């Protein structure tokens, strides 16, 4: 927690505390879900999912594996003591519709922004998780980096420039799912996320459907 205090403003800390309180509600909803949607709690208290990538931490290989399986590759950045990360696991990923969609369409690699594990970036350069986070300009958690379905020779393969989209912080379940749909549909080729989201909301309203209140 000391690292978090040093890097968060007073306003951000208050927001984090509020999110933690809200997470108690999310936890109740999550654990009402079937067993297969419950997260795995690690010894350090952090959460993960049984279906996240079991990786050798070589990004080119993880990317190619996802591609060969017809999926998109994404990195989920977390850190110890992060209330929004907890909410992501106990609420968002505990909703069957969301979990099933992501599992079917994405390979997710979970990393720690302060982690010391060795990892190989897309350009073949080795470094720690912490260094990769800095290289990718990841400063807050949770952050999700989404990558293209294929790299061309003109595509920069390092840092933030390698992404096609980014989820910069905690998104509520409806927005969370929509972001994954946006990436899967290559919506980033046509419009920014907020426009894609707006069209989805308008479409639901036009057909008399309510926005899910997860």
Q: In which residue ranges do the predicted regions lie?
A:
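N-terminal secretory signal peptides
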Residues: 1-8, 16-23
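Structural micro-motif
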Residues: 129-147
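Short active-site neighborhood of thiol/selenol oxidoreductases, capturing the structured segment around
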Residues: 69-82
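Typically the conserved alpha-helix immediately C-terminal to a functionally engaged Cys/Sec
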Residues: 86-101
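N-proximal helix/coil linker or "cap" segments that precede and/or mark the start of modular domains
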Residues: 33-52, 205
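Thiol-based oxidoreductase modules, predominantly thioredoxin-like and allied folds used
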Residues: 99-127
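A short beta-strand-turn-helix
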Residues: 55-71
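Non-catalytic, surface beta->alpha helical segment in thiol-disulfide oxidoreductase systems
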Residues: 139-140, 147-188
């Amino acid at each position: 927690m000391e690292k978090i205090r040093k890097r968060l403003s007073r306003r951000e800390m208050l927001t984090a505390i509020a999110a933690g309180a809200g997470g108690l509600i999310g936890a109740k909803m999550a654990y009402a879900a079937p067993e297969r949607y419950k997260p795995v709690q690690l010894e350090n208290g952090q959460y993960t999912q049984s279906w996240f990538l079991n990786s050798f931490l070589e990004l080119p290989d993880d990317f190619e594996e996802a591609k060969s399986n017809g999926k998109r590759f994404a990195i989920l950045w977390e850190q110890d003591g992060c209330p929004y990360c907890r909410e992501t696991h106990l609420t968002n990923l505990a909703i069957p519709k969301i979990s099933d969609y992501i599992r079917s369409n994405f390979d997710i690699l979970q990393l720690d922004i302060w982690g010391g594990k060795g990892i190989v970036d897309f350009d073949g350069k080795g470094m720690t998780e912490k260094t990769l986070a800095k290289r990718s300009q990841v400063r807050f958690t949770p952050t999700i980096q989404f990558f293209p379905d294929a790299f061309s020779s003109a595509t920069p393969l390092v840092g933030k420039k390698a992404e096609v989209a980014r989820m910069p912080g905690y998104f509520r379940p409806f927005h969370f799912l929509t972001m994954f749909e946006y990436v899967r549909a290559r919506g980033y080729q046509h419009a920014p996320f907020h426009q894609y989201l707006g069209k989805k909301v308008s479409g639901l309203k036009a057909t008399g459907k309510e926005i899910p209140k997860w």
